[in-house]
């Protein structure tokens, strides 16, 4: 597989400032997925979150099914579903159904999550999140194979269950696992098919660092090295690791400043949401609004994103391609609430041009 460029993440969130109701917003997002397919993008990705005033859609399987039904070629993936919140048999059935409906175009991305309110809302706790994820994957693998599920875990016990229909893809849809800690990378090397790195998260910046992300290329190189080492420990192929990079940004024909102008309000709203989720005190993100930020603060925020034209973005993404190799999927987050539909579609078209250049 050559390097690929996909579009993410679709969370289905709704904001009244758009002038649309939530139904119209969801239909608009499905139309953008169709537009992404026409632009030649490889994939679209749906993420899962619950219980927040930003109106995130937690029902990721139906959302993905709507995208599958509206398209013919593009890969539709969960990037990422929160594994500890799901019953493993239900997840196995939903993933198999999506794979059958799509004709084998579905990929299952899984994360362990980090928000206590989400675990508690589904009757779980943070301390069980890793074990629940491991057992869910093991049960799904059994369920997608021949015969019945026979599983005795610390959390789940399932016996005599024959999940049907079986997936189209032999062995089931590929499982992508996210995270940024070496333990998460090792877990993916042992259980998954592809590792997903979030370009917006740098574990070293929180562990004795200064709170700022290291350079993107440095972090990609480090993650690929750690992933290869983990694959080797588990006796798996290390030659061309299956690696995804989730990176935020926006494209505009007039360059970086125009891209930021289109995205600034929406991006800073997203940063405030994540500031809350990461446990910051409200006063710490009270001034995270473009009109309250200094020029220096704005430049710092721009540096968290890939902004500009295809010519602007090609150099750094081609270096990422060269670091990772041929099994790279770049999950480019260019879908944000509050951004005008026409500007989003324009960014998608430019992503299509960028994909062509990266694959040349």
Located regions from the model:
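Active-site-adjacent structural elements that line small-molecule/cofactor binding pockets in enzymes
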Residues: 1-360
């Amino acid at each position: 597989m050559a390097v690929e460029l996909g579009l993410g993440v679709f969370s289905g969130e709704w904001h009244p400032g758009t002038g649309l109701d939530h139904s119209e917003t969801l239909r608009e997002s499905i139309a953008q997925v169709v537009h992404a397919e026409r632009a030649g993008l490889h994939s679209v990705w749906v993420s899962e979150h619950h219980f927040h005033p930003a109106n995130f859609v937690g029902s990721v399987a139906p959302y993905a099914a709507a995208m599958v039904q509206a398209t013919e070629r593009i890969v539709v993936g969960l990037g990422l579903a929160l594994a500890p919140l799901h019953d493993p048999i239900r997840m196995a059935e939903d993933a198999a159904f999506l794979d059958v409906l799509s004709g084998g175009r579905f990929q299952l991305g899984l994360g362990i999550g980090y928000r206590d309110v989400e675990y508690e809302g589904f009757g779980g706790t943070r301390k069980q999140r890793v074990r629940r994820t491991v057992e869910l994957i093991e049960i799904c693998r059994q369920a997608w194979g021949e015969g019945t599920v026979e599983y005795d875990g610390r959390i789940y016990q399932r016996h005599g269950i024959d999940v049907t229909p079986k997936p189209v893809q032999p062995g089931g849809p590929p499982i992508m696992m996210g995270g940024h800690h070496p333990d998460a990378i090792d877990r993916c090397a042992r259980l998954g098919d592809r590792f997903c790195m979030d370009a917006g998260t740098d574990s070293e910046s929180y562990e004795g660092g200064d709170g700022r992300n290291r350079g993107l290329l440095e972090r990609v190189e480090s993650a690929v090295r750690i992933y290869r080492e983990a694959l080797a420990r588990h006796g798996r192929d290390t030659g061309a690791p299956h690696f995804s990079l989730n990176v935020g940004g926006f494209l505009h024909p007039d360059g970086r400043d125009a891209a930021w102008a289109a995205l600034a309000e929406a991006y800073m709203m997203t940063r405030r949401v994540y500031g809350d989720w990461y446990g910051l005190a409200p006063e710490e993100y009270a001034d995270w609004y473009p009109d309250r930020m200094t020029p220096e603060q704005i430049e710092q925020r721009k540096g968290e994103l890939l902004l500009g034209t295809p010519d602007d973005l090609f150099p750094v993404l081609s270096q990422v391609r060269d670091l990772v190799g041929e099994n790279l999927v770049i999950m480019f987050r260019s879908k944000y609430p509050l951004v005008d539909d026409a500007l989003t579609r324009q960014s998608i078209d430019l992503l299509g041009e960028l994909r062509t250049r990266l694959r040349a």
